[in-house]
Every structure is written in structure tokens, then in C-alpha cells.
């Protein structure tokens, strides 16, 4: 069994460490609890611009010198902006661990936000927004997120063209000063490293970094807005997105929700692939997945079909979810559970993955969760639990977004759901 260490450092950092002494690598992840939800409503895209510009120069180094310093120790680094967090990840040899932390402290604590680099990033973000027009699936994701989560959590990380035009370097500095503090940081470490040394290194390099107050941990309210919206676009295919409320990652029914999604969309023998694509030939692609911001959970169904078959595809997607409570078989349940457990044991076996999983545990549960505990909850799911979940979470309030030549026609599959008022075409 893994021996996790979890503590709050005097500097304000919440730290989790998973020692893996047989591996000659260390991975760490720094999550700053400020993502797009922390942006002013008229400056959407700001959080991503800050993340993209942090490593373009510090008080000590230029952006190129900073990259050279990471390369000199063979560190693999990455960063990203999400709804609730801005994340920085690193994998490095144990002997270079402290240097890697030192470099991250430098870019997080003393960025200079060079004007030329900032301007380039604004232009790149604008180009990426324009590029969404050539990615129908990404466009549907953007549109449905607004309806599923509301004006705060439903923001797109890139922002909008009109808000990007208002963002200045001074805005980036203000966002960094207000949100980048040790008290807003969750740090996970996994690999060949003594937990005490990990704590000492992070304490030393982040001591005095802003407030130690544990900010950014309260869930942000979701504003779910059921309804149907169509976005006309000259495409050969029709994109369909469906969303309905599920449960959050800390809910007792979360393992049941995971297994349901495994039955629907977990592998080549899953229901959606078999019934919607293989047997009926309705779709080019089809999937079901979940998203779980803190305190909320959403289930999504997505498909790409022909405009002529969009109504049939929509009805079939919902029918396959409903049908689970009628004819689920024990062998089907066991296959889904085996797939989930195998995925946890194989894809999650790399040091980087274990580090990311530990960060997720701290973020969602406030503690490290042993893999054995997660596996036990998955394997305990029964057919009766799945039926109870589906009965307790009816699909009677849906967000539906279509993108393509024609809207849904208002078939019985659409109108039988409460709150399904059709919005004007966008």
C-alpha cells in the first residue's frame, strides 16, 4: 500500500507526497487555485494569457534563458489553464529536483510579463479563437459549456475576441498579484524523493510568497440552464451535444456514475458504439463522458451524424441511457468494472500520472486517496445501484446544442423533457 504524506506548509502550500523509491524520476505538479473563473467578466481570456506569459521572462532571466535552464537539467515542463486552476507540471531526475522547484518559484514569484511577449500571446489567442470555427466538436463544447455551467464556470479558456481586445499587460499583472500566492497552491510530488526533503524544498523556495490564507477552495456555483439551441453552420455533418446533471467527484454515487459511463462509452463493446454506430450506422463518432468541477457533476453525450438523421440520433442517444435501467446484464457490468480498474492500474502507473492523480485527490477530496480505496468502490457497484442511480437522476432537464445545417425538429424525444424550451437560432 502506498504511504502518502499530506501536510500544510508554513508558507501556505498544501502538499501531498507519494514516495516511489524504486523509480529514478520525480514528478511534481503545482496547482494555483485560480482559473478562468477568477477573471473579471469583461476580461475573459486573461487567466490563459497570464499562464502563457509567466515563463517569458523573470527578474533574473529572459524567457529563452529560463527555457535553457530547464533544458540544462533535462526537465519536462508543461502548464495549462482550467476552469478553477492554473497548473504547472514537471518531471525531472531526483538530483535536479530542487533546481526545478527553484526555477518554478522564479517564474511564479518574479515574472516580468514582457510587453512584446504579451502582445504575441494576445494575437495567438485571437488566432486560436478563429481556429475554433474549423473545429465543429470544439465549438459545440464551447456552446454547451455556457448552458451547462453558466456565465462563470462556462467560460472558454481562450476568452472572446471582444474581451481579448480589452486586456492589457497591467491586467495580467493585477491578476497575478491577486491570485498567485502560496496559500492558493496545491502541490503534489511523486517519485524517488524523501517527503521531508520535498517539504523543505517547497517551503524554502515559496516562503513569503503572498498570503498564506487558504483561498480558492470554495466550490463555484453552477447555473444549469436547460434548453435547446441550434447554431447554423454549413457543414456536411451535424454535431449534437447533450448534457444533464450528474453527481460530483465526492458524492457517494460517483463510482456508480463512473461505471455507467464505462458501460455506455468504455471501449469497442460499449453500448453507444455498438448500438448507435455499429448496428444502426447513425454516427461518425459517439461518446459519453463526465466533467466534475468541485461541488457539481455533469454527464455529456456527443455525436456527429448526417443532418437527415440528427433527430433519430438524438432520440437513440437518450434511449440508450434510459435502456440501461431496463436490460443491463451482469456480464456487461463486470466488463465495465474490469475496464475501469485496468485503466486505473495501467494508464495511471507512470510517475507523472500518479502525481496528477494525487493532485486531483487533494483538489476534490482534500486528502490523498489510496488506489485500493478507489478500486473497492468501483468493484462494489451492482446492477441495483445502477438502476437506483438512473431512477434518482432522471434525464428530464437537458442542455442540448446542435451545430450544422438543420436544427432538431421537436420530435417526441425532445419535447418529453421538462424545461426543454427551444432557443432562437444563433
Regions found by a protein language model. Name each.
Residues 1-4, 225-227:
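Short, hydrophobic/aromatic-rich segments at coil-to-beta transitions
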Residues 4, 8, 16, 65-214, ...:
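Charge-rich, well-structured scaffold segments of protease-associated domains
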Residues 13, 18-34, 44, 213-270, ...:
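His/Glu-based metal-binding/catalytic segments typifying zinc-dependent metallopeptidases
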Residues 38:
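Catalytic and substrate-binding regions of extracellular carbohydrate-active enzymes
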Residues 45-56:
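Active-site SXXK
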Residues 273-274:
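Phosphate-proximal small/polar/acidic motifs at interfaces that engage nucleotide phosphates
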